[in-house]
Structures are given as structure tokens and as C-alpha cells.
Design a protein with these regions (language model features):
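Ankyrin-repeat boundary/"N-cap" motif
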Residues: 9-28, 51-80, 106-132, 159-177
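Conserved ankyrin/ankyrin-like repeat signature
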Residues: 36-37, 88-92, 141-145, 189-190
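Short coil/linker segments at helix-helix boundaries
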Residues: 79-90, 127-143
Length: 199
């Protein structure tokens, strides 16, 4: 790889229906949590803002910049109580931003990095019975990631104003309630975190 810099940004385009079609080695390494390989690839010219080409990936696939993959990794690791792994993903988010990843680049379904972090945290926080042991660390992780994204230029206003649910994120998360079983507002946990952060 060190002799062929282009290799770190090449993508698999084979005909077999594999998940890595259209992904760069960096993207695959991030999804697999191979942090030494990630470091090596970035040091050798891998694109920290790489995103799959929608024309190459299987139909109906969501294409996303590698920054989003790292954000997902930080929360997915928590679901398996892999706390050190989750911390490594947070550090990777910082590294990707330092290398030039765009903190405002959307997925092919228009999700901003802030939105990806909020969505991932909300998934856990709204399922307290399924994830009782990671509620507090999920809140902490969300704030850490938001801090990094905003430090490197993420546009809070763009996310708040974005009409993603038929209403703005501001209305969806701060004003609307969503009642689950036992008439409990399952959106309240994420709302409390976001109100403390955005207000």
C-alpha cells in the first residue's frame, strides 16, 4: 500500500452481493473495528471523507461518509458493552475530523453527522428496558461526539432546522412527544440530553 497510494481509496466492484461493494479499505476497516489498519490507511493517504458511489453499491443501499460509520461504531459497541471499543471509535471520530472529514456531510438519505449521533443515541435511550446498563454512558458518549463535531464546524442550526420527519428536528425532538407502552414518553430521555446541550 505504501508503494501504491491509490490502493487505499480503491473500491470493490465485484458482481457478488457482498456488503463491501463500493467501499474503500478504510470504510471496511472502520466497520470491522480494525484500528491499527485504520491508522495505517490514513497515514498512507486514505480519504477521510470517503463515501460510496450510489451507482456502484447494491440497490436501496444507504451510502454514507466514513465519519458516519465511526459514529455508528461508537454506539454499536456500547450495545455489546464493549466500552473500550466505543472509546476508540470516539477517538477515531476526532482523528477523521483532524484529517479533514466534513462534519456536515450527509448520507445519501440526507442524515447529517449530528443527526446520525442523535439517532444512534435515541435508539438506545428510548429502549431503557433493553439497554438498562448503558443509559448513562450513552448520554455521555453523545455529548462527547457532539462536542467534537461542533468543534470542527458542524452546523447546529442546519440540523435543528432540517425537515427530516415532516417537521424540523427542533420540533421532533424538543416539542413533540412519543408515547410508548404504559403511556410513557419514550422521547423524553433524548430530549433531556439535547435540551441541556442546545439551549
Amino acid at each position: 500500500i505504501s508503494k501504491n497510494i491509490k490502493a487505499v481509496n480503491e473500491v470493490y466492484t465485484g458482481k457478488a452481493p457482498k456488503k463491501d461493494i463500493g467501499q474503500s479499505p478504510l470504510q471496511v476497516a472502520i466497520k470491522c473495528g480494525e484500528f491499527e489498519i485504520i491508522e495505517f490507511l490514513l497515514e498512507n493517504g486514505a480519504d477521510p471523507d470517503f463515501m460510496e458511489n450510489p451507482e456502484v453499491v447494491p440497490p436501496h443501499s444507504v451510502c454514507m461518509p466514513v465519519l458516519h460509520d465511526a459514529i455508528i461504531g461508537a454506539f454499536s459497541a456500547l450495545c455489546y458493552k464493549q466500552y473500550m471499543q466505543s472509546e476508540k471509535y470516539v477517538n477515531l471520530i476526532k482523528i477523521l475530523l483532524e484529517y479533514g472529514a466534513n462534519p456536515n456531510r450527509k448520507t445519501s438519505s440526507e442524515i447529517l453527522p449530528i443527526g446520525m449521533a442523535v439517532n444512534q443515541a435515541d435508539f438506545i435511550l428510548s429502549r431503557k428496558s433493553a439497554y438498562p446498563d448503558i443509559q448513562e454512558i450513552t448520554q455521555k458518549r453523545l455529548l462527547e461526539i457532539l462536542d467534537l463535531l461542533i468543534e470542527y464546524g458542524a452546523d447546529k442550526k442546519e440540523w435543528l432546522d432540517q425537515d427530516f420527519w415532516g417537521v424540523s428536528n427542533k420540533v421532533h425532538y424538543f416539542e413533540e412527544k412519543q408515547y410508548g407502552t404504559n403511556n410513557i414518553d419514550i422521547r423524553e430521555p433524548i430530549r433531556i440530553v439535547l435540551e441541556g446541550y442546545f439551549h
